[in-house]
């Protein structure tokens, strides 16, 4: 129950004016209002965390709490330099929390460079000031290597670090193939020059490649590492029916890498394929093909057709050759037969001459076609002495021949020999023939009866047909009639 003051300004029972009590009563009785504001922070949220002290450094203030806008300053002891901000401020962020700005924590670094640790090397000096160069010596068999090959120097920096810090290297530790081991510890990153590595394989494996490797002066190995292969890398080779196989190298107790197997067949059988070898390569037989033996008399499909085709070709070739030979033989026989019919062997030599015509055993010389149509001609037989023959040829060149039925030439001149003379008329034919015949003392000459018969025959012919040219009655034997 509230007590109100009177008009005289009396106080209430609480010792306050009555109007104040009325205002307080109104505030307590009115409904609450909606107000937007920052959340109320706790005590821990109203201060920044302690930034701490840098090693070999000092902080100001060294104690106390850091409220908003508080400042902390840092410095380093002698011989050390500050790295980072020299002061930081406690700042409120957008989310209402407090924190240091800048947030990087400063540190104090030694102004001298500490000697670095380099494996397989000895560092000469223990204290290095900024700008000093590092002096080291590598162990025997190792060589110094710099990251920057152009500088070839390591310098102490102002922050106490080393620039272009070198290393001492040898040959890098070689790889260990599977199923093998070597005489180098696994903890060694590199080995000195001249080191020899000995590789060995576990039981059941065979070494393929060099057994020893040496580290060369140029920091590379003398050869590539070997590998260990399974001694029985390949399974049993496939068997074939009616055959067997043999190994190279012999005997076939293990089928290691590189083993060659040669197949063969039992007597009476042969391999169907020409290739009969397989090789063990990395645990597999190569080439992978099916081999089998077949009987020798077995013929493959198409073999009979090819055989018939071969016989056909051979038969056709033989028939063609025989026909050609038969034609050649027939032509030769026909040619010989024609020659034998034209000039039999028992005929005198005079009949074989195409310019001689034998009439009742008398050889009569025949003129050529040009001589027959040009004039009269009379020539002694071929068995006259050479002198008479030359005179007859001389007479033939000077005077054209005359035949019965034609007027004798006015320019005919008797030959010097007297053996051959021109026949100007039919009445002189007998005398001309008598002059042409050789004497009875000449071998092979004709007797008087034969001469008389020849003269009589020619006179009868001339008297019967005085106007007929002898060249028209006597057939000319041309060169074309020799061939059949």
UniProtKB/Swiss-Prot annotation:
Its main localization is: membrane
Region Disordered: which residues? 374-484
Q: Which residues form the Sushi domain?
A: 46-110, 111-168, 169-230, 232-295
* Biased composition range(s): Polar residues: 424-442, 449-467
- Provide this UniProt record's keywords sorted from A to Z: Disulfide bond, Glycoprotein, Membrane, Repeat, Signal, Sushi, Transmembrane, Transmembrane helix
Q: Spell out the subcellular localization from the entry.
A: Membrane
Q: Which InterPro entries does the entry mention?
A: SUSD4, Sushi/SCR/CCP_sf, Sushi_SCR_CCP_dom
Disulphide bonds in the chain: 48-90, 76-108, 113-156, 138-168, 171-215, 201-228, 234-280, 265-293
Q: What happens when the gene is disrupted?
A: Morpholino knockdown of the protein causes defects in development, abnormal locomotion and increased mortality. At 3 days postfertilization morphants have abnormally (delayed) developed eyes.
What topology in the membrane does the UniProt record assign? Single-pass type I membrane protein
Question: Which residues are listed as membrane-spanning?
Answer: 311-331
Q: Signal peptide location in the record?
A: 1-35
Quote the protein name from its UniProt record: Sushi domain-containing protein 4
Organism this protein belongs to: Danio rerio (Zebrafish)
From the UniProt record, report the name of the gene that encodes this protein.
Answer: susd4
């Amino acid at each position: 129950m509230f007590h109100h003051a009177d008009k005289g300004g009396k106080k209430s029972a609480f010792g306050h004016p009555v109007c104040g009590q009325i205002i307080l009563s109104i505030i307590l009785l009115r409904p609450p209002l909606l107000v937007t504001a920052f959340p109320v922070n706790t005590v821990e949220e109203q201060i920044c965390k302690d930034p701490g002290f840098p090693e070999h450094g000092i902080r100001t203030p060294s104690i106390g709490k850091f409220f908003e806008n508080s400042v902390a300053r840092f410095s380093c002891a002698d011989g050390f330099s500050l790295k980072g901000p020299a002061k930081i401020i406690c700042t409120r962020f957008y989310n209402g929390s407090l924190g240091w700005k800048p947030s990087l924590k400063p540190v104090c670094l030694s102004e001298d460079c500490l000697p670095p640790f380099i494996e397989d090397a000895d560092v000469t000096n223990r204290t290095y000031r900024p700008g000093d160069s590092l002096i080291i010596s590598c162990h025997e068999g190792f060589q110094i290597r710099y990251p920057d090959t152009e500088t070839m120097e390591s310098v102490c920096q102002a922050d106490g670090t080393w620039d272009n810090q070198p290393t001492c290297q040898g040959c890098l530790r070689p790889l260990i193939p599977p199923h093998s081991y070597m005489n180098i510890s696994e903890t060694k990153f590199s080995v000195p020059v001249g080191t020899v590595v000995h590789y060995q394989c576990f039981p059941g494996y065979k070494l393929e490649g060099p057994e020893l490797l040496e580290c060369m002066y140029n920091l590379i190995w003398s050869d590539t590492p070997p590998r260990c292969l399974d001694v029985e890398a390949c399974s049993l080779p496939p068997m074939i029916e009616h055959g067997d196989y043999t190994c190279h190298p012999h005997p076939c107790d293990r089928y290691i890498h590189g083993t060659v197997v040669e197949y063969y067949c039992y007597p009476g059988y042969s391999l169907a394929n020409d290739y009969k070898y397989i090789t063990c390569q990395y645990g597999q037989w190569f080439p992978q093909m099916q081999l089998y033996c077949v009987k020798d008399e077995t013929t493959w499909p198409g073999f009979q057709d090819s055989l018939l085709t071969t016989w056909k070709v051979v038969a056709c070739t033989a028939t063609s050759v025989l026909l050609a030979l038969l034609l050649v033989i027939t032509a030769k026989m026909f040619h010989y037969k024609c020659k034998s019919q034209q000039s039999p062997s028992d005929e005198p030599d005079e009949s074989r001459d195409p310019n001689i015509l034998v009439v009742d055993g008398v050889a009569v010389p025949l003129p050529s076609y040009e001589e027959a149509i040009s004039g009269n001609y009379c020539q002694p037989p071929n068995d006259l002495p050479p002198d008479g023959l030359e005179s007859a040829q001389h007479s033939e060149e000077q005077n054209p021949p005359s035949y019965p039925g034609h007027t004798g030439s006015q320019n005919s001149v008797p030959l010097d020999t007297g053996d051959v003379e021109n026949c100007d008329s039919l009445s002189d034919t007998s005398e001309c023939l008598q002059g042409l015949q050789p004497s009875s003392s000449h071998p092979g000459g004709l007797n008087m009866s034969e001469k008389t018969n020849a003269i009589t025959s020619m006179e009868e012919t001339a008297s019967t047909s005085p106007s007929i040219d002898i060249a028209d009655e006597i057939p000319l034997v041309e060169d074309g009639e020799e061939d059949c």
